[in-house]
Amino acid sequence: MKLLVKLGGTLLDSAASRDSLCLQIAAARAAGHEVTVVHGGGKQMTRYLTDRGIESRFVGGLRVTSPDTIDAVLKVFAGSVNHELVANLNRAGALAVGLSGIDSFLVEAEQMDPELGAVGRVTGSNPALLHLLTANGYVPVVACVAGDRLGQIYNVNADQMAVACASAFGACRLIFLTDVDGVMDNSNRVRPVLTAAESRQLIDEGIATGGMQAKLNAALSALADGVQQVRIAPGAAPGALQRILAGEEIGTKMVTA
């Protein structure tokens, strides 16, 4: 099965959860699944900027990316976070390869809004490299950085990067492993299953807001692009990925209808 696993930056900030997730991804690859990983790193980015006296500014939940910040994006997302994750996956037994959307125009982007600086909107994807690597037993690990044909580099929302890669790669499942238990209803209970229509209703009624609204919108885009199933699940739950692949209902499963 072709899988796209998106790892939230908060999970990667903990050595214990990072090591556990890497073991699970390596096990999924060993079981015959073709796995591509996309990762965030917002928490690590904020810490990096704070240590250097650079303020983190957000507009509509998106990080304003100045020339100073885009340099940090490359160093943190495509540098330290990506390389540490690749090293951990290799130690776990996977053959991981670190990438970003810039590599072979894997994911192309354009400037979203001048007010946001170098924040990109995905405009296209070229999955040949993902197919080549996964077909030969490798696990691509993609940082949320993309570019255009003129060489401009953009910071791209990691959830949108995951959707772009999942859709282009032809993933059967897109699994968001995050720091929440799933999608909550208005009684603060996890919804085990959501259709696309029910997801839109949670957004329209203001129940899903902020980061969860962004994840639901990303999931809806993935479903519309042909991904069969999207899951939003707690990555820190013991054996979360293995249990999901075994059919256990963890977090929230999203389907078209």
Swiss-Prot record:
It is an enzyme of class 2 (transferase). Its main location: cytoplasm. It is found in: Cytoplasm. SUPFAM superfamilies: Carbamate kinase-like. Substrate binds at G41, G42, R63, N155. Belongs to the acetylglutamate kinase family. ArgB subfamily. This is Acetylglutamate kinase. The gene is argB.
